[in-house]
Regions:
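Helix-to-loop junction immediately C-terminal to a conserved catalytic motif
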Residues: 52
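ABC ATPase nucleotide-binding domains
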Residues: 74-231
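Pre-Walker A (P-loop) beta-loop-beta motif of ABC nucleotide-binding domains
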Residues: 24-35
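Conserved coupling/switch loops of ABC nucleotide-binding domains, chiefly the family-specific signature
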Residues: 58-61, 111, 211, 346
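Conserved ABC transporter NBD signature motif
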Residues: 60-68
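A short, flexible loop at the N-terminus of ABC-type nucleotide-binding domains that lies
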Residues: 2-3, 11-23, 72-76
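The feature captures the beta-strand-to-loop junction immediately N-terminal to the Walker
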Residues: 37-39
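Non-catalytic connector elements of ABC transporters
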Residues: 239-241, 251-357
Length: 357
């Protein structure tokens, strides 16, 4: 087990003027599961590959424990990777696939067999040890890939979107399985995903990246409750946060004639700016007779919850507003709702910098 550190780590691909990863400073604590999350091109997989030794580090350094591994060959770093593709050998059975890295490391046969037996039992794979990958389901193949990493007993697990090939139901199950396994083993883990639901449900902390730069690093709850900037606010949360520019005067916003009093802690700074980006989670909009008029375009009913996707005449023109509604009595398409933000659920951002006030 080991602490992992990126210290100003930068990667610029040949022929590009932009850094794929730009001066990343990040410490992953021993035994922690940290999730790197962001859209395509954010630098999350580049960071993982640099940690594994599969990408060059153009400047800065990378550490595993007390060892600077910046220029160390991948095979000497003692990390195990799990990929989106299971990368199993089709002609080997499950036991041989799991034992393969131990065989390459010249681990004695008796020890190989004992490690495979122990890990197979842990991952509920014992009855499949004699089967070939083609005889397994997607979830079982992913567990075999996990088992092959676990038997190595590495300093860290590096997981690159390992659940992307699974259907929705299996992803939910495997999210819980991976999180439980990591807690049980206590192995430092870096997990890469574009799926913010995976990030929120699995990580002890999450690192949100965009265009190669770290936007925010904190617990899932803290990132959701206090997004550092407009990008994080719009990326983390499903459905996404509503973001609306509004003018401010005397400590209040004006939304199409509806006056919204700002929290006292933010009112002076917002008034000084004169204009802010107002962030509203869908569950922070409540029905009110004096609220903003919003026409229902679509209702997304997911059973326990329902969301109305509405059009509203807001500053800057007609905008989309998403509001959580009563799933037992959802509104009809074309119906007009009156919605008012909950004052203590407002998020305020500087429109020039995008940073949180």
């Amino acid at each position: 087990m080991a602490e992992l550190r990126f210290e100003g780590a930068t990667r610029i691909y040949p022929g590009s003027d932009e850094a794929a990863l730009d001066s990343l400073d990040l410490k992953v604590d021993d035994r922690e599961l940290i999730v790197l999350v962001g859209p395509s091109g954010s630098g999350k997989t580049t960071a993982l590959r640099m940690l594994a030794g599969l990408e060059d580090v153009d400047s800065g350094s990378i550490w595993i424990g007390d060892t600077d591994v910046t220029y160390m060959p991948p095979k000497e770093r003692d990390v195990a990777m799990v990929f989106q593709s299971y990368a199993l050998y089709p002609y080997l059975d499950v036991a041989a696939n799991m034992a393969f890295p131990l065989k390459m490391a010249r681990v004695p046969k008796a020890e190989r067999e004992e490690r495979v037996r122990r890990v197979a039992e842990m991952l509920e794979l014992t009855e499949y040890l004699g089967r070939k990958p083609s005889q397994l389901s997607g979830g079982q193949r992913q567990r075999v890939a996990m088992g092959r990493a676990v038997v190595r007993e590495p300093k860290a697990f590096l997981m690159d979107e390992p659940l992307s090939n699974l259907d929705a139901k299996l992803r939910v199950q495997m999210r819980a399985d991976i999180a439980a396994l990591q807690q049980r083993l206590g192995v430092t883990t870096v997990y890469v995903t574009h799926d913010q639901v995976e990030a929120m449900t699995m990580g002890h902390r999450i690192a949100v990246l965009r265009d190669g730069r770290l936007q925010q690093l904190d617990t899932p709850r803290a990132v959701y409750a206090r997004p550092a900037n407009v990008f994080v606010a719009g990326f983390i949360g499903s459905p996404a946060m509503n973001l609306v520019e509004a003018e401010v005067s005397d400590g209040a916003c004006d939304l199409s004639g509806v006056r919204i009093e700002l929290p006292a802690a933010f009112a002076p700074a917002a008034t000084k700016l004169g204009r802010v980006v107002l962030g509203l989670r869908p569950d922070a909009l409540e029905p009110a007779a004096d609220g903003v008029a919003a026409r229902v375009d679509v209702v997304e009913d997911v059973g326990a919850e329902a969301y109305a996707f509405c059009s509203a005449d807001l500053p800057g023109g007609e905008r989309r507003l998403i509001a959580r509604v009563d799933s037992r009595r959802p509104p009809e398409q074309g119906e007009t709702l009156r919605l008012r933000p909950l004052a203590d659920e407002l998020h305020l951002f500087d429109p020039a910098t995008g940073e949180r006030l």
